[in-house]
Amino acid sequence: SNIFKGPTVGSSVVAMSARLASTEATFQAKPFKLHKLDSGPDVNMHVTKEDALRYYTQMQTIRRMETAAGNLYKEKKVRGFCHLYSGQEACAVGMKAAMEPGDAAITAYRCHGWTYLSGSPVAKVLCELTGRITGNVYGKGGSMHMYGENFYGGNGIVGAQQPLGTGIAFAMKYKKQKNVCITLFGDGATNQGQLYESMNMAKLWELPVLYVCENNGYGMGTSAARSSASTDYYTRGDYVPGFWVDGMDVLAVRQAIRWGKEWCNAGKGPLMIEMATYRYGGHSMSDPGTSYRTREEIQEVRKTRDPITGFKDKIVTAGLVTEDELKEVDKEIRKEVDAAVKQAHTDKEAPVEMLLTDIYYNTPAQYVRCTTEDVLQQYVTSEEAFKALSK
């Protein structure tokens, strides 16, 4: 065989091909903890150089973009709430890597990374934060309400996305689509009643939904241990099978979702997946994040479990990429984010007229009551208004 056991990087053993060492490699994930499953995802994870570079670029872009978002908030350019994804990048990037055309995702308010991965350039995300007309939703959504193709947001209410994701999965089954809906929430939202109502319906009708708990350890300022009688969130579904995955390992996350998709596509119904991750910042920008945990705890995670540093060490050690290649990637990311920050400062703000757009999905026929000219104005879409204002 041309496969041999390479060095251990963090908790992962590198298995490399002697013949293809520079273009592909295999790593081992931490064991997946299972609930009501006879077997789970394979711990052996294969990755090509092309994919490795893409995942690194995406994670690093999200990290730098969120740093820029935090700085814009401190400059008082961002109004309202602002929840950053720093530390959790491997979750979104790994999940997106496993998704196929037609698959959907829906999350809560920590949505900047998902918006970027769903097709919005960094500039669109940052311009949305500063209320610019060039933002993801023309400056009207702000930090918590951003969207993309098959990405349903961005929801500002804790747990509100859980029944919505279940509904998206219901539509997929009704239309006989071979797709899944990834429904994301944090550990703090696992105690919300709508999660259990949703899981009951999903299991009753065997819906293709993956309930994913991004367990970053804290719901606002409350640790998981103080808020939950059981912190094994992957077992919360009771009659819904589930498993635990290391959410700081982008390849393990990808492996988990690929396996989950196969489960759903086989008609077996929902799964509950817990991704163990960590957020470096506070719950939001108004939370310093150090009153309920120590700075030493944060630094320890950065030092031993950081998703970007850990992945970088793996792929460099395996010979997939060089330090110089990654430095070039970092350089390009800096340029992109710096240019986006300038746009977020200087692009036109959304005008007051935009408040009247997107009130309804489409324009009703004239014979409908109350469709006077002033009411019809409310049926204009943001896109139509943007085009008119750009003339």
Curated annotation (Swiss-Prot):
An annotated GO BP: glucose metabolic process
Cofactor or coenzyme needed: thiamine diphosphate; Mg(2+)
EC class (word): oxidoreductase
List of residues binding Mg(2+): 187, 216, 218
Transit peptide interval: 1-17
Binding-site positions, thiamine diphosphate: 109-110, 156, 158, 187-189, 216, 283
Residue sites binding pyruvate per the record: 83, 109-110, 148, 156, 158, 187-189, 216, 218
Binding partners and assembly: Heterotetramer of two PDHA2 and two PDHB subunits. The heterotetramer interacts with DLAT, and is part of the multimeric pyruvate dehydrogenase complex that contains multiple copies of pyruvate dehydrogenase (E1), dihydrolipoamide acetyltransferase (DLAT, E2) and lipoamide dehydrogenase (DLD, E3).
Protein name as annotated: Pyruvate dehydrogenase E1 component subunit alpha type II, mitochondrial
Sorted UniProt keywords: Carbohydrate metabolism, Glucose metabolism, Magnesium, Metal-binding, Mitochondrion, Oxidoreductase, Phosphoprotein, Pyruvate, Thiamine pyrophosphate, Transit peptide, Tricarboxylic acid cycle
GO (cellular component) term, any one: mitochondrial matrix
NCBIfam families in alphabetical order: PDH_E1_alph_y (TIGR03182)
Compartment(s): Mitochondrion matrix
Primary location recorded for the protein, binned into one broad class: mitochondrion
Keyword Plastid attached: no
An MF annotation (GO) of this entry: metal ion binding
Enzyme Commission designation: 1.2.4.1
Activity regulation, free text: Pyruvate dehydrogenase activity is inhibited by phosphorylation of PDHA2; it is reactivated by dephosphorylation.
Organism this protein belongs to: Ascaris suum (Pig roundworm)
Superkingdom field: Eukaryota
Catalytic reaction equation(s): N(6)-[(R)-lipoyl]-L-lysyl-[protein] + pyruvate + H(+) = N(6)-[(R)-S(8)-acetyldihydrolipoyl]-L-lysyl-[protein] + CO2
